[in-house]
Amino acid sequence: MNILLANPRGFCAGVDRAISIVERALELFSPPIYVRHEVVHNRYVVQNLKERGAVFVEELDQVPDDSIVIFSAHGVSQAVRAEAKRRGLKVFDATCPLVTKVHLQVARASRKGIECILIGHAGHPEVEGTMGQYDNSAGGVHLVESPEDVAKLVVKDPDNLCFVTQTTLSMDDTADVISSLQKKYPSIEGPRKDDICYATQNRQDAVRNVAEEVELFIVVGSKNSSNSNRLRELAQKKGTQAFLVDNADDVDATWFNGVERVAVTAGASAPEVLVKQVVDAIAKMAPSVVTEVEGQLEDTVFAVPAELR
């Protein structure tokens, strides 16, 4: 069997930074260290940090007074930041800098009273944090996921609008939504550069480049990982059977019946150790040749807060 490994895959700079922040906090301060929401959406990573003393909570009222709390890579609303400040909690912010960039765009729109439309998935923590940057009742913030949502959208002033996007969306689907917005609201303003992050784009391009060369695509990532789900969907749209797996235990031997070429990638929050385990599990089913497929090189690094260096 030929196993093609897509590149780039796995951890991005924002995930690396977020995990490093939790690890350094655990090293420098006594556990428990509280983390609001899963620092990244990966079961393996979260369990590893739990075993080292991290305590994951969904709300700040679960964090005792005088504690250290870390905000996840997905970001938080202004209300959460204000609550942490009011309670005097020591905060380390693991929000991805590319998410922070979107937050600043929304906050700027709020200050100017410009209605803001966010393209994203309802219920995702990044979306909740981004919408929570807007607090001007003179304008408003709206969430859309599809061209159908755009068709139903009602705004106060069609000539005073901007849009931003969640960073981990499908590039193709997002382009369709943006096109619908621009047709309905010709004067709408968007970001100077696409808000979908470089790592999301690169991993989707890697899947796009390989999908039609294989009969099966395995994406390593957790079920609640937005960017991992988009990789699986993209492979399927290319006509390739694709599955999302948390680890090697999820790999089903029946998927490989009659398959000669399989590709493997990993979402931006999945560590390489899980990819290796999946490849090893596939290789046990049949003699295999593993090939690294060339892709976009990534050298972006985001520094951790100075206090944790």
UniProtKB/Swiss-Prot annotation:
Active site: 126
Keyword entries, A-Z: 4Fe-4S, Iron, Iron-sulfur, Isoprene biosynthesis, Metal-binding, Oxidoreductase
UniProt pathway annotation: Isoprenoid biosynthesis; dimethylallyl diphosphate biosynthesis; dimethylallyl diphosphate from (2E)-4-hydroxy-3-methylbutenyl diphosphate: step 1/1; Isoprenoid biosynthesis; isopentenyl diphosphate biosynthesis via DXP pathway; isopentenyl diphosphate from 1-deoxy-D-xylulose 5-phosphate: step 6/6
Residue positions binding dimethylallyl diphosphate: 41, 74, 124, 225-227, 269
A matching Pfam family: LYTB
Binding site for [4Fe-4S] cluster: 12, 96, 197
Cofactor(s) essential for the protein: [4Fe-4S] cluster
GO biological process: dimethylallyl diphosphate biosynthetic process; isopentenyl diphosphate biosynthetic process, methylerythritol 4-phosphate pathway; terpenoid biosynthetic process
Binding site for isopentenyl diphosphate: 41, 74, 124, 225-227, 269
UniProt-listed Enzyme Commission number(s): 1.17.7.4
Annotated catalysed reactions: isopentenyl diphosphate + 2 oxidized [2Fe-2S]-[ferredoxin] + H2O = (2E)-4-hydroxy-3-methylbut-2-enyl diphosphate + 2 reduced [2Fe-2S]-[ferredoxin] + 2 H(+); dimethylallyl diphosphate + 2 oxidized [2Fe-2S]-[ferredoxin] + H2O = (2E)-4-hydroxy-3-methylbut-2-enyl diphosphate + 2 reduced [2Fe-2S]-[ferredoxin] + 2 H(+)
A GO MF term: 4 iron, 4 sulfur cluster binding
The family this protein is said to belong to: Belongs to the IspH family.
The protein's name in its UniProt record: 4-hydroxy-3-methylbut-2-enyl diphosphate reductase
Taxonomic source organism: Shewanella pealeana (strain ATCC 700345 / ANG-SQ1)
